[in-house]
């Protein structure tokens, strides 16, 4: 039997991802990237809720059901409003009682 759960709304997923990003970026990003992010985020920063990719197994080594997770990207957007410098990709469980997440940081 399939377990029912309420999916995260985009704003909540974005808030969760951004909070985690701010807390962990210093430990996971190159100091140059942190400086770039801090200098340009106000004008070019973006936190985007995107369609959950089905290739997370390659990133985290675990097969996931894309319907059970939200995906959020944190980065900088260019003049065409496309995110072309991604600092972190987040995979966040929709299950509130078991809110697990995975992060792929910019290398």
From Swiss-Prot:
Disulfide bonds: none annotated. InterPro entries: dsDNA_mimic_put, Put_dsDNA_mimic_sf. Belongs to the putative dsDNA mimic protein family. NCBIfam families: PRK05094.1. May act as a double-stranded DNA (dsDNA) mimic. Probably regulates the activity of a dsDNA-binding protein. This is Putative double-stranded DNA mimic protein HS_0995. It comes from Histophilus somni (strain 129Pt) (Haemophilus somnus).
